[in-house]
Amino acid sequence: MSKTIIEFKNVSKTYADTDTTVLKDISFELEEGKFYTLLGASGSGKSTILNIIAGLLDATDGDVILDDKRINDLPANKRNVHTIFQSYALFPNMNVFDNVAFALKIKGVDKKEIAKRVSESLKLVRLDGFEKRSITKLSGGQKQRVAIARAIIDRPKVLLLDESLSALDMKLRKDMQYELRELQQSLGITFIFVTHDQEEALAMSDWVFIMNEGEIVQSGTPTDIYDEPINHFVADFIGESNILNGKMIEDYLVEFNGQKFEAVDGGMRKNEPIEVVIRPEDIWFTLPNEGKFNVKVDTQLFRGVHYEIVAYDEFNNEWIIHSTHKAIVGETVGLDFDPEAIHIMRLNESEEEFDARIEEYVEEEETVGLAKAVEEENAEEEAAIQEAVKEALENTMELTELAETVNEILQKQENETENSESGDHK
């Protein structure tokens, strides 16, 4: 089990002069050597958490633990934590070497050791040979790398990154996402990244915290959060979503848009009001009346890798569809999707209740899945026997030959059963 490097225990932050609470009873544990992202809009509290960890802000209530020690009263310069700000905070009057070496010089580290470690750090960020380059002569991406090299030169326990990619252009920002992730994995230190950009969070993180109005709304892996948003806010915040009101008729059967649809969610009350989420990329077009229902195409935009198409159904619900096929504005088409594309959100469900429900029906699904696999295997064997009978009738196969074929199939089934039981006993 990985070691916990940072822990928040019921941490709150209130500004007394305005009586404004920006963090509300925050608790979490972060494991050593992972990439975490605090994701939220401006004012959600994500940068406040970062500044409390760094020692730039004091928590009003609660405990902040770093490497098994309470650090609420520990000065910022005594914490083995480094921060990279959005502005990078580089010294324009110093060259690259002096910027990267700054912290080691302050600590009085030997000159030979400084030179060695500066060289190692610059190599890690792919800037070897830039030691004498002026900061003013660097591109935005190069400045970003210098800031990272300076932050990692004395191997902090935790690296904090506050919106540190937001000043870069789109292509460079995507390149830096790969580089940051690779760097974190090669160094093995904990990264805590703050952003409002959903794509950055999903691309780089081991674990994401979604924040809103000073609270953690949902936390989980990028895949979990994207595929199973806990509520309307998360579903809408993480990528494009089609969100509709509906009713859970029973486990695995949901009603919305005046129709009943097979789903994969369970663990709810019968006829419970819910919200349905279907991602735009999980929908495809059909001919009219051949899909789940019809829609009329209203607008479309070309996004480079796909068309983003907006359409409306007979109830005037808006549907966003991502398709590689161009639509015709004004035409009526059918929409279709798989049961797995329908994600169910309960109203006012806490994260603890949500996690428990997901775990419960996932376990049930695994059990049902095993039984279904056995059933399908038996059906395949029965189909094979029927096919052999059919072939015998069509080709006047001798009865003895037919019997041998059937016996071979049955013997194979018996052997597989014995092998399976033998494996279970081991």
Curated annotation (Swiss-Prot):
Q: Which UniProt keywords apply?
A: ATP-binding, Cell membrane, Membrane, Nucleotide-binding, Translocase, Transport
An annotated Gene Ontology molecular function: ATP hydrolysis activity
Q: What is the lineage of its organism?
A: Bacteria, Bacillati, Bacillota, Bacilli, Lactobacillales
The record's section on InterPro entries has: AAA+_ATPase, ABC_SmlMolc_Importer, ABC_transporter-like_ATP-bd, ABC_transporter-like_CS, Mo/tungstate-bd_C_term_dom, P-loop_NTPase, Transp-assoc_OB_typ2
Q: How does it sit in the membrane?
A: Peripheral membrane protein
Entry's localization field: Cell membrane
- One short Pfam family name for this protein? TOBE_2
Q: Describe its function.
A: Part of the ABC transporter complex PotABCD involved in spermidine/putrescine import. Responsible for energy coupling to the transport system.
Principal localization reads: membrane
Q: Quaternary state and partners of this protein? A: The complex is composed of two ATP-binding proteins (PotA), two transmembrane proteins (PotB and PotC) and a solute-binding protein (PotD).
Residues holding ATP: 40-47
Q: What protein name is recorded for this chain?
A: Spermidine/putrescine import ATP-binding protein PotA
**What does the similarity note say?**
Belongs to the ABC transporter superfamily. Spermidine/putrescine importer (TC 3.A.1.11.1) family.
Gene Ontology cellular-component terms listed: ATP-binding cassette (ABC) transporter complex
Q: What is its EC number?
A: 7.6.2.11
Domain named ABC transporter: which ranges?
A: 6-238
Q: Which reaction does it catalyse?
A: ATP + H2O + polyamine-[polyamine-binding protein]Side 1 = ADP + phosphate + polyamineSide 2 + [polyamine-binding protein]Side 1
According to its UniProt record, this protein's enzyme class is: translocase
